[in-house]
Amino acid sequence: IARKFNSTYGEAFTIPEAMLDSDIVMIRGRDGRKMSKSYGNHISPDHTEEEIYERVKSFVTDRKKLSDEGDPYECPVFDLHRAFNRDGEVEVARACRNATSKCYDCKTGELPDLIADSYSDYRTRKAEISDGFVLDVLREGNIKAREVTSEKMDQVRKFMLMDYLK
């Protein structure tokens, strides 16, 4: 939208730059598709530790037999290790490739605890926040946004030759 406006009326908006980290991976859900709340295959910070454990345990892995060597990059559970178990990621990949650990162990070991621990600050903070606090933050943000956007909207109206009412 900003690019189209700028090309039509003039340089009013800054074009945002992508800020992608090459280390970020798409995390697949328990069915192998992209993890998504709409697919119902996600792990949410709102889930309890028990729910996280059950969801991780239900992930589909890539090996057919326990003796088969695995490919960690084909396994959605390894996506979770890459996101939540950075210290143990290399060892998990090695054990998968060598078939020295069972997929079930990979899912039920420390991984669910690591995920739950990473979400614990969120859950604690969420419990502390009241509805009144949220409304106060929204009001303050609204006031600040109006100050910033009123100047920008004046500039936009000028570019579009719609500032004749002043």
Model-derived segments and spans:
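Conserved nucleotide- and phosphate/pyrophosphate-binding catalytic cores
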Residues: 2-166
